[in-house]
Amino acid sequence: MAEKIVMKNGQLQVSDRPIIPFIEGDGVGHDIWKNAQAIFDKAVEVAYEGKRHIEWQELLAGKKAYDKTGEWLPKETLEAIRESLVAIKGPLETPVGGGIRSLNVALRQELDLYACVRPVRYFDGVASPLKEPEKTNITIFRENTEDIYAGIEWEAGTADVKRVIEFLQTEMNVNKIRFPESSSIGIKPISIEGSKRLIRSAIDYALKNNLKKVTLVHKGNIQKFTEGGFRKWGYEVAQEDYKEELLAGRLEINDIIADNFLQQILLNPEKFDVVALTNLNGDYASDALAAQVGGIGISPGANINYQTGHAIFEATHGTAPDIADQDKANPCSVLLSGCMLLDYIGWTEAAQLITSAIEKTFKADIFTADLAFGKQAYSTSAFSNQILSIM
């Protein structure tokens, strides 16, 4: 009988027939999901000789949800993910204007998915702008709920922003706003709790995966108390909770200014194993790193709360409406995110089957259009069928 995944004593409890919700996604979501689901199902069947099976449960979000329910993110969808703990999703459209914030950000904040985890690695055969892309093998831990993504801001010229500026000037003696009459104002919250839980998760991940170096990426040279606090609290976590690992040489923790980090990932990417970043810096760095190994079409991602067990694994690219329903999209982002999901629930054998099949497909010079670069471009279904045949 199919059962929901639950958290007991800090550990996920996963039956042989777990219920896992999925959100198909908008745009190319339909093309990539129908192929990805077939690959997930076969990998599980082969890896466990038919003894395990995922019971997929479709949830609505994005344009598909709006067309059917009049809501972009139905409460039922949020509640189903809360109850099931683990879910996977395709790309979601967010309408421009109308006061509706990013659906992806809404999901992360509503479920307190504080860690955005993005493993970035190179696959042989994939075109890259780097001479030695194989040196790039970095896992990003991006804080997911704070920073400017909290959405606390006021528009220039409004009564609200005038009140904020007046308060800053009269009550806080702030005199550094260059053009107070025409400025928009935003607030950047960075908390001790938010920073420490993110950095603790990054360190735990490094130790679990036998990775030694954890690097704190920040702009503490300019923003002393927010970005600088992130750096300070990261070192505190290491000293308070991981002193034994530090003394034994199993863990090294260091830090780097964000702009220097963006240089070093090009010049010396092998210097980094796991990196922890604030939200905005993590946004920049994750897409920059993805470009080094072939682009976001092959970049997986997960949004995780390691304390509650809640996790959403997702395609990291957009909806690409220009190629929707044309069987052209690259399914690898959602496939590799699915591998992260399988690893997360302990089904590593199935994840390894898919990863290995993708590696062999690339080595055989079989690519979708975004990675072909003058070579023959394969359709989504043809590319996926090649993976299925290898498994």
UniProtKB/Swiss-Prot annotation:
GO terms for biological process: glyoxylate cycle; tricarboxylic acid cycle. Homodimer. D-threo-isocitrate binds at residues 102, 104, 108, 118, 142. Pfam families: Iso_dh (PF00180). SUPFAM superfamilies: Isocitrate/Isopropylmalate dehydrogenase-like (SSF53659). Mg(2+) binds at residue 283. Its EC number is 1.1.1.42. The record marks 149, 219 as: Critical for catalysis. It catalyses: D-threo-isocitrate + NADP(+) = 2-oxoglutarate + CO2 + NADPH. InterPro entries: IsoCit/isopropylmalate_DH_CS, Isocitrate_DH_NADP_dimer_prok, IsoPropMal-DH-like_dom. Binds 1 Mg(2+) or Mn(2+) ion per subunit. The gene is icd. It comes from the Bacteria. Keywords: Glyoxylate bypass, Magnesium, Manganese, Metal-binding, NADP, Oxidoreductase, Tricarboxylic acid cycle. GO terms for molecular function: isocitrate dehydrogenase (NADP+) activity; magnesium ion binding; NAD binding. The keyword Amino-acid biosynthesis does not apply. This is Isocitrate dehydrogenase [NADP]. Its cofactor is Mg(2+); Mn(2+). Belongs to the isocitrate and isopropylmalate dehydrogenases family. Catalyzes the oxidative decarboxylation of isocitrate to 2-oxoglutarate and carbon dioxide with the concomitant reduction of NADP(+). SMART domains: Iso_dh.
